[in-house]
């Protein structure tokens, strides 16, 4: 629900939304950087306490946005943004010819997996690897990467509820 609400808001404001779906925060950071996106947005719901989850904003360099920016975004969402001696209006909706589009960006996730595989200094050929994905965001990346590095990979807890 959060994913599609965010997509609706972005596209209604004239922006395109590239979806990686369930994935890891490092993959969003990597794709934001290498594919030259203005930013990356990660909706997180992890093993962390609830107050550490929510929306993570990543800049075009693949880094977490500075705290000052995050606070401005939070104030804007709360309707309390007052900067440069003025209140900021709601984001305008795009005109029909400028509505953004949603792109299922599996290519991005695959590129990230290729990057991880390219880092493989060691061969895992003949090595048995057990992965507990904890039903989390790495479930659709981890096995593919270890398999590509030659491991005999066994995975448990790779059924996240999304």
Model-derived regions, located:
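Gly/Ser/Thr-enriched, mixed-charge loops and adjacent short helices
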Residues: 53-162
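Ferredoxin-reductase
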Residues: 1-61
């Amino acid at each position: 629900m959060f994913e599609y609400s965010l997509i609706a808001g972005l596209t209604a404001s004239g922006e395109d939304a590239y979806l990686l779906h369930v994935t890891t925060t490092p993959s969003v950071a990597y794709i934001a950087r290498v594919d030259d996106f203005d930013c990356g947005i990660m909706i997180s719901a992890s093993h962390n306490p609830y107050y550490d989850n929510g929306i993570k904003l990543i800049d075009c360099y693949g880094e977490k946005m500075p705290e000052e920016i995050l606070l401005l975004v939070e104030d804007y969402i709360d309707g309390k943004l007052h900067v440069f001696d003025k209140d900021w209006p709601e984001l305008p909706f795009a005109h029909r010819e400028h509505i953004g589009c949603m792109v299922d960006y599996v290519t991005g996730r695959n590129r990230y997996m290729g990057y991880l595989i390219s880092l493989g200094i060691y061969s895992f050929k003949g090595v048995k690897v057990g992965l507990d994905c904890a039903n989390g965001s790495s479930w659709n990346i981890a096995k593919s990467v270890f398999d590509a590095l030659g491991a005999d990979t066994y995975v448990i807890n790779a059924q996240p509820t999304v």
